[in-house]
Amino acid sequence: MALKIRLTKVGSVHQPLYRVVVAEARSRRDGDAVENLGTYTPKSKGSPIKLNMERVDYWLSKGALPTNTMHAMIKKARRSAAAQAEAAPAASA
């Protein structure tokens, strides 16, 4: 059972919205998912990526492979989380 971390489209025309899911590699794009890990809203003004990083790390440790797009998004989410963690102590001091 090969698992992939990938995007499934749930938005409508001109309003894209994607779920970040763990799914069987051979299943359809919008087919059944094993678990929902977050959302990606490309047209949002704020942070377009919302991920549960604990669950992402769990599935990566279990052997799930991210698609190329998801690999880049996970890296971006990790960088933004690290930047927020550094900014929080500086703001409170």
Swiss-Prot record:
Keyword set, alphabetical order: Ribonucleoprotein, Ribosomal protein
Gene Ontology cellular component list: cytoplasm; small ribosomal subunit
Gene Ontology terms for molecular function: structural constituent of ribosome
Ribonucleoprotein among keywords: yes
Pfam annotation, one family: Ribosomal_S16
InterPro entries in alphabetical order: Ribosomal_bS16, Ribosomal_bS16_dom_sf
The keyword Nuclease belongs to this UniProt entry's keyword annotation: no
GO biological process assignments: translation
Family: Belongs to the bacterial ribosomal protein bS16 family.
Name by which UniProt lists this protein: Small ribosomal subunit protein bS16
Gene source species: Opitutus terrae (strain DSM 11246 / JCM 15787 / PB90-1)
